[in-house]
């Protein structure tokens, strides 16, 4: 499966199939949440949250790819990510794009 954030794939003629998406909501363990709170006092990267967001992006992308495979896509173009805070310590990641087939 080819994944790109452009609206084309060089040297490929494409047939548009449908919009595909994937999402997940992730939260951190309370202990790590408290430790991250202390980290905000001194500054620096909140690695627990960076790791959580990276994991969430991977899960959401995997779900989007599975949906695209289900409709027989060869690639997903124009991929975009969006995130939002759902509640303290939890975030939603959504990824979406256009499933296409090579002609």
UniProtKB/Swiss-Prot annotation:
SUPFAM superfamilies: YbjQ-like (SSF117782). InterPro entries: UPF0145_dom_sf (IPR035439), UPF0145_YbjQ-like (IPR002765). Disulfide bonds: none annotated. Belongs to the UPF0145 family. PANTHER family: UPF0145 PROTEIN SCO3412, UPF0145 PROTEIN YBJQ. This is UPF0145 protein Amet_0532. It comes from Alkaliphilus metalliredigens (strain QYMF).
């Amino acid at each position: 499966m080819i994944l790109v954030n452009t609206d084309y794939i060089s040297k490929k003629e494409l047939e548009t199939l449908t919009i595909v998406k994937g999402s997940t909501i992730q939260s951190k363990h309370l202990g790590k949440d408290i430790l991250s709170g202390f980290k905000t006092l001194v500054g620096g990267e909140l690695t627990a949250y960076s790791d959580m967001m990276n994991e969430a992006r991977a899960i959401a992308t995997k779900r989007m790819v599975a949906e695209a495979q289900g409709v027989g896509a060869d690639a997903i173009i124009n991929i975009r990510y969006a995130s939002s805070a759902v509640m303290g310590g939890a975030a939603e990641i959504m990824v979406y794009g256009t499933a296409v087939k090579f002609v």
